[in-house]
Amino acid sequence: MARLKEIYKKEIAPKLLKDLELKNPMEIPRITKITLNMGVGEALADKKVLENAVSDLEKIAGQKAVVTRARKSIAGFKVREGWPIGCKVTLRSDRMYEFLDRLISISIPRIRDFRGISPKQFDGRGNFSMGVSEQIIFPEIDYDKIDKLRGLDICISTTARNNDEGRALLKAFNFPFKG
């Protein structure tokens, strides 16, 4: 079992039950999935760029990435429906907790000029999204072997009912919020 999963079950869940004044243990907020998304607009001109992005995302997640395709044509961006424009990975269960552990303890501290994550990045329903401007903050990526610095989106989906519950959950996991 992943280290953070054990910590959640033994320490975080009972603490949240008491702090949020919940009556039923099934109401305790938990993380359901983590989605990593990398939009690769340059893939329209060069297919090799998308292959490199997919391999980077697979190294970061430890799981196979899925190529995302354009849902509709947009003439302004010179995109046709069905063209590959990015890649994504959805992590659940043990892999999700292992990724979250690496993100909190290793990757986030490696962000340049890092002063804490803004607590305003919640969506109103307890889900948290953040952008990472460089994939080299992850230890799995070798700086000498990448072709270009690319950013990615990290979305953490929770069962929290509002932003306060979601923030309390992530703060219990030692997420480095500002203030």
UniProtKB/Swiss-Prot annotation:
Cite the GO molecular-function annotations of the record.
rRNA binding; structural constituent of ribosome; tRNA binding
Which Pfam families does the entry link to?
Answer: Ribosomal_L5, Ribosomal_L5_C
Q: Which InterPro entries match?
A: Ribosomal_uL5 (IPR002132), Ribosomal_uL5_bac-type (IPR020930), Ribosomal_uL5_C (IPR031309), Ribosomal_uL5_CS (IPR020929), Ribosomal_uL5_dom_sf (IPR022803), Ribosomal_uL5_N (IPR031310)
GO annotation terms (biological process) = translation
Instruction: Alphabetically list the UniProt keywords.
Output: Ribonucleoprotein, Ribosomal protein, RNA-binding, rRNA-binding, tRNA-binding
GO cellular component terms attached to this protein's record: ribonucleoprotein complex; ribosome
Q: Using the chain's own numbering, where are the disulfide bonds?
A: none
Instruction: Provide the function of this protein.
Output: This is one of the proteins that bind and probably mediate the attachment of the 5S RNA into the large ribosomal subunit, where it forms part of the central protuberance. In the 70S ribosome it contacts protein S13 of the 30S subunit (bridge B1b), connecting the 2 subunits; this bridge is implicated in subunit movement. Contacts the P site tRNA; the 5S rRNA and some of its associated proteins might help stabilize positioning of ribosome-bound tRNAs.
The record's annotation in NCBIfam families points to: PRK00010.1
Assembly and oligomerization: Part of the 50S ribosomal subunit; part of the 5S rRNA/L5/L18/L25 subcomplex. Contacts the 5S rRNA and the P site tRNA. Forms a bridge to the 30S subunit in the 70S ribosome.
Q: Which HAMAP family match?
A: Ribosomal_uL5_B
Family of the protein in this entry: Belongs to the universal ribosomal protein uL5 family.
Please identify the protein, giving its name as recorded. Large ribosomal subunit protein uL5
Q: Which organism is it from?
A: Saccharophagus degradans (strain 2-40 / ATCC 43961 / DSM 17024)
Tell me the classification of the organism that encodes this protein.
Bacteria, Pseudomonadati, Pseudomonadota, Gammaproteobacteria, Cellvibrionales
Q: Which gene encodes it?
A: rplE
